[in-house]
Swiss-Prot record:
PsaA and PsaB bind P700, the primary electron donor of photosystem I (PSI), as well as the electron acceptors A0, A1 and FX. PSI is a plastocyanin-ferredoxin oxidoreductase, converting photonic excitation into a charge separation, which transfers an electron from the donor P700 chlorophyll pair to the spectroscopically characterized acceptors A0, A1, FX, FA and FB in turn. Oxidized P700 is reduced on the lumenal side of the thylakoid membrane by plastocyanin. It catalyses: reduced [plastocyanin] + hnu + oxidized [2Fe-2S]-[ferredoxin] = oxidized [plastocyanin] + reduced [2Fe-2S]-[ferredoxin]. It comes from Angiopteris evecta (Mule's foot fern). The chain crosses the membrane at residues 46-69, 135-158, 175-199, 273-291, 330-353, 369-395, 417-439, 517-535, 575-596, 643-665, 707-727. The gene is psaB. Chlorophyll a B3 binds at residues 662, 670. GO terms for molecular function: 4 iron, 4 sulfur cluster binding; chlorophyll binding; electron transfer activity; magnesium ion binding; oxidoreductase activity. GO terms for biological process: photosynthesis. Belongs to the PsaA/PsaB family. The PsaA/B heterodimer binds the P700 chlorophyll special pair and subsequent electron acceptors. PSI consists of a core antenna complex that captures photons, and an electron transfer chain that converts photonic excitation into a charge separation. The eukaryotic PSI reaction center is composed of at least 11 subunits. Keywords: 4Fe-4S, Chlorophyll, Chloroplast, Chromophore, Electron transport, Iron, Iron-sulfur, Magnesium, Membrane, Metal-binding, Oxidoreductase, Photosynthesis, Photosystem I, Plastid, Thylakoid, Transmembrane, Transmembrane helix, Transport. P700 is a chlorophyll a/chlorophyll a' dimer, A0 is one or more chlorophyll a, A1 is one or both phylloquinones and FX is a shared 4Fe-4S iron-sulfur center. Its EC number is 1.97.1.12. This is Photosystem I P700 chlorophyll a apoprotein A2. It is found in: Plastid, Chloroplast thylakoid membrane.
Length: 734
C-alpha cells in the first residue's frame, strides 16, 4: 500500500477517518512530534525553512515594485505627491459594468485601478527612486535575491552543507554575527545609500550607477572624516523653505541633528535619518565584537548569567541555569524573539504616524490610518504567539532540576500572587472605567451633561510638558526656558523639536483630555486582561491544584474524560485561544481611539472627539455609526461609487465573523450526526454516489473546531474593520 499523507506520522497516516487529514495539516509544522526526528534534524529543517521564508518575502516585495512599475503612476505621483492618488495595480474584473468601470478609473489611469494605501510610493520616493525604470530594476534585483535564497535553502539540506548541532548551539557567534552583520553593517550600508543616493536626489541631483563614483555626496569629500572634523558634515543643512526633490533651498550637510520636521514634506529630515542610521551602525558593530568566540576574549553569556545573583540571597539563585535552559529550548528562544518583535511592531505603529520618516506620508491620511492599524494587529498576533511558545516551553522543555530556585522556578512558585495581581488590576480597571462611562451616559440621557465625571489626565499632560509641549502651562524641563535640558539642546535639535511638538497640524504629542483619560484606562483594562489569560495558561501549563499532572497531557487537550469532568478548558492551548479574543478586543479599542482622534484632528473639529468620547453612546453614535454611513452607501438603488468594494468587504467581513460562532458555540455530537446524515444521503444519490471517499467522515475535535472558529472570528473582525477604516477615511479625504 502506498504511504498516505501525512508521511511524517506513521500513526496518523493509518487513521481510517478524516481525522488523518485534519491532524496531518495541524501538525505539519510541529517538527518535534514527527517520526524519526532527531534534535539535529529538527534544527536543520528549521534553518532551511528560514531561507524559504526570506525567498517568499523578497518575491512579495519584488511583486509590489513590479506591479507599480507596470500598472501604477509612480512618475506622475512624484510630480505632485499631494494631489495625485497613488495606484497599487490595475483591476481586471469581468463582472464590472460601465458604472463600476467609471467609479474605479482614477489616479489618471485608463481603466479600473486599486489605490495604494500602503505608503510604498512615499517610501520609494524618499529613498531616491524616481522612475518606473528604477522600480523595474529593484523588482529584478529582489527576484534574483529570492532565487538565491531558495538555492541556499536547498543547499543547506544537502549532506555536505548541513550545519551540525554544535553550530546551532553556538550562541555567542550567532549574536556577534547578527549584531555586527545583520544590524550593524546593514545599517551602515543603508546610511551609505541615504548619503550617496537619497539625499542628493532630495536636492535635485540624480545619482545612479553611472555617476555613483564621481558624484561627491559632500563638497569636501572624505577630508573632514580623515582629519577628525566631523562636525563639517552637519554644517549648512537644508533650509526651512527647501522644496523636496529640487535644489531650491537645499544645503550640503549630510549628517545633521536638526530635530522636528521638514516643513514641506512634514517628515523627519533625511539628513537626521542618515545620522541616526550611522549611529546605530557604530553601536551595533561594536556590540557585535563583545562576545567570546574563538579568540578567548570578550564576554561569555553563560558567565554573565551565572553571575547575576541578587544580593542578600532573598531572591534565590537569579539567572543560574538559564543559559542552558534557553540555549536548548527552541520554544523559549522563539518566545523571546516573538515578544521582542511584538513590542517593536507596536512601537513601529506608534512612531510611524507621530514621527513620519517618509516624505508626504503624513498628509496621506488613509495611508496613515491603514499603517497604524496594520502594525497594531500584527503586533497583537505576534505577542499572543510569544505567550503560546512560552507555555509550550514549560510543557516540553522546562527541567525543574536545571532551574532550581532561579528566576524561572520562582515565577512558577509565585504564580498565585502573579495571577491574582493581574486579576485584581483587570477587575479594578474594568469596573471603574465602565462605571465612569456609564455614569456619563446616564447624565447625558437625563439632559444634565454638566454632571459628567470628567478627569483631566494631569500626569500624562505633565509628561507631555516635560517633552516641551507648552499648552498645559506646566513650567518643567523642556517647557521651561530656564532648565539645563532646555539650554543644552538650544544650539542643536531643540528648536526644530519644540516647533514640531507645539504645532497642532501634526500628530506629535496630541492634546489630551478627559476622553483620552477614559479610553486610556479602557485600553489598560484590555491589555491587563489579555496578558492575564496566557500568563495564567503558561504558569499553570505544567500543573495546577485541580490537575497536578497536566504536563503529561501536552499543550492542547480538550478534557481528561468523565472521571475528572472539571478539567475541560484548562489546557495551555485554551488560554492562548481565549487570549486572542481579548487581544482583538483590545486592539479594537486602540484603533477606534487612534482613528477617531485623528479624523477629528484632520477635519479640524477636535471638539467632536473631546465632547463625545466621554460616554459610550458618543463612541457608538459619533464614531462607529457616523463613519459607517459612506460605507453602507457604497452601492444603493441609485448606483454605486468607488467605495462599493469596501461596502461589500464590510458585509463579507461580518459574514465570516458570524460563521466563526457556528464553530465556537456548537458541540461535537451535533456535527457528527449531521455529517453521518449527509454521508448517508450522498451515498444514496445517483451520480453523487459515483464519488466515494476512503476515510470515514468524522466531526472536528473540540480543539480543532475552536481553531476554525477562532480563525473565522479573527479574519472577519479584521476584514470588517479594515473596510470601515479605509472607506470612512478615504471617503472624507479622497
Amino acid at each position: 500500500m502506498a504511504s498516505r499523507f501525512p508521511k511524517f506520522s506513521q500513526g496518523l497516516s493509518q487513521d481510517p477517518t478524516t481525522r488523518r487529514i485534519w491532524f496531518g495539516i495541524a501538525t505539519a509544522h510541529d517538527f518535534e512530534s514527527h517520526d524519526d526526528m532527531t534534535e539535529e534534524r529538527l534544527y536543520q529543517k528549521i534553518f532551511a525553512s528560514h531561507f524559504g521564508q526570506l525567498a517568499v518575502i523578497f518575491l512579495w516585495t519584488s511583486g509590489n515594485l513590479f506591479h507599480v512599475a507596470w500598472q501604477g503612476n509612480f512618475e506622475a505621483w512624484g510630480q505632485d505627491p499631494l494631489h495625485v492618488r497613488p495606484i497599487a495595480h490595475a483591476i481586471w474584473d469581468p463582472h464590472f459594468g460601465q458604472p463600476a468601470v467609471e467609479a474605479y478609473t482614477r489616479g489618471g489611469a485608463s481603466g479600473p485601478v486599486n489605490i495604494a494605501y500602503s505608503g510604498v510610493y512615499q517610501w520609494w520616493y524618499t529613498i531616491g527612486l524616481r522612475t518606473n525604470q528604477d522600480l523595474y530594476t529593484g523588482a529584478l534585483f529582489l527576484l534574483a535575491l529570492s532565487a538565491l535564497f531558495l538555492i541556499a535553502g536547498w543547499l543547506h539540506l544537502q549532506p555536505k552543507w548541513k550545519p551540525g548541532l554544535s553550530w546551532f548551539k553556538n550562541a555567542e557567534s550567532r549574536l556577534n554575527h547578527h549584531l555586527s552583520g545583520l544590524f550593524g553593517v546593514s545599517s551602515l550600508a543603508w546610511t551609505g545609500h541615504l548619503v550617496h543616493v537619497a539625499i542628493p536626489e532630495s536636492r535635485g541631483e540624480h545619482v545612479r550607477w553611472d555617476n555613483l563614483l564621481t558624484a561627491l555626496p559632500h563638497p569636501q569629500g572624505l577630508g573632514p572624516f580623515l582629519s577628525g572634523q566631523w562636525s563639517v558634515y552637519a554644517q549648512n543643512p537644508d533650509s526651512t523653505n527647501h522644496l523636496f526633490g529640487t535644489s531650491q533651498g537645499a544645503g550640503t550637510g549630510i549628517l545633521t541633528f536638526l530635530g522636528g520636521f521638514h516643513p514641506q514634506t512634514q517628515s523627519l529630515w533625511l539628513t537626521d535619518i542618515a545620522h541616526h542610521h550611522l549611529a546605530i551602525a557604530v553601536v551595533f558593530i561594536i556590540a557585535g565584537h563583545m562576545y567570546r568566540t574563538n579568540f578567548g576574549i570578550g564576554h561569555s553569556i553563560k558567565e554573565i548569567l551565572e553571575a547575576h545573583t541578587p544580593p542578600g540571597g532573598r531572591l534565590g539563585r537569579g539567572h543560574k541555569g538559564l543559559y542552558d535552559t534557553i540555549n536548548n529550548s527552541l520554544h523559549f528562544q522563539l518566545g523571546l524573539a516573538l515578544a521582542a518583535l511584538g513590542v517593536i511592531t507596536s512601537l513601529v505603529a506608534q512612531h510611524m504616524y507621530s514621527l513620519p520618516a517618509y516624505a508626504f506620508i503624513a498628509q496621506d491620511f488613509t495611508t496613515q490610518a491603514a499603517l497604524y492599524t496594520h502594525h497594531q494587529y500584527i503586533a497583537g498576533f505576534i505577542m499572543t504567539g510569544a505567550f503560546a511558545h512560552g507555555a509550550i516551553f514549560f510543557i516540553r522543555d522546562y527541567n525543574p532540576e536545571q532551574n532550581r530556585d532561579n528566576v524561572l522556578a520562582r515565577m512558577l512558585e509565585h504564580k498565585e500572587a502573579i495571577i491574582s495581581h493581574l486579576s485584581w488590576a483587570s477587575l479594578f480597571l474594568g469596573f471603574h472605567t465602565l462605571g465612569l462611562y456609564v455614569h456619563n451616559d446616564v447624565m447625558l440621557a437625563f439632559g444634565t451633561p454638566e454632571k459628567q465625571i470628567l478627569i483631566e489626565p494631569v500626569f500624562a499632560q505633565w509628561i507631555q510638558s516635560t517633552h516641551g509641549k507648552a499648552l498645559y502651562g506646566f513650567d518643567v524641563l523642556l517647557s521651561s526656558a530656564d532648565s539645563p535640558a532646555f539650554t543644552a539642546g538650544q544650539s542643536l535639535w531643540l528648536p526644530g523639536w519644540l516647533d514640531a511638538i507645539n504645532n497642532n497640524s501634526n500628530s506629535l504629542f496630541l492634546t489630551i483630555g478627559p476622553g483620552d483619560f477614559l479610553v486610556h484606562h479602557a485600553i489598560a483594562l484590555g491589555l491587563h486582561t489579555t496578558t492575564s489569560i496566557p500568563v495564567k495558561g503558561a504558569l499553570d501549563a505544567r500543573g495546577s491544584k485541580l490537575m497536578p499532572d497536566k504536563k503529561e497531557f501536552g499543550y492542547s487537550f480538550p478534557c481528561d474524560g468523565p472521571g475528572r469532568g472539571g478539567t475541560c478548558d484548562i489546557s495551555a492551548w485554551d488560554a492562548f485561544y481565549l487570549s486572542v479574543f481579548w487581544m482583538l478586543n483590545t486592539i479594537g479599542w486602540v484603533t477606534f481611539y487612534w482613528h477617531w482622534k485623528h479624523i477629528t484632528l484632520w477635519q479640524g473639529n477636535v471638539a467632536q472627539f473631546d465632547e463625545s468620547s466621554t460616554y459610550l453612546m458618543g463612541w457608538l453614535r459619533d464614531y462607529l455609526w457616523l463613519n459607517s454611513s459612506q460605507l453602507i452607501n457604497g452601492y444603493n438603488p441609485f448606483g454605486m461609487n468607488s467605495l462599493s468594494v469596501w461596502a461589500w468587504m464590510f458585509l463579507f467581513g461580518h459574514l465570516v465573523w458570524a460563521i466563526g460562532f457556528m464553530f465556537l458555540i456548537s458541540w461535537r455530537g451535533y456535527w457528527q450526526e449531521l455529517i453521518e446524515t449527509l454521508a448517508w444521503a450522498h451515498e444514496r444519490t445517483p451520480l453523487a454516489n459515483l464519488v466515494r471517499w476512503k476515510d470515514k467522515p468524522v466531526a472536528l475535535s473540540i480543539v480543532q473546531a475552536r481553531l476554525v472558529g477562532l480563525a473565522h472570528f479573527s479574519v472577519g473582525y479584521i476584514f470588517t474593520y479594515a473596510a470601515f477604516l479605509i472607506a470612512s477615511t478615504s471617503g472624507k479625504f479622497g
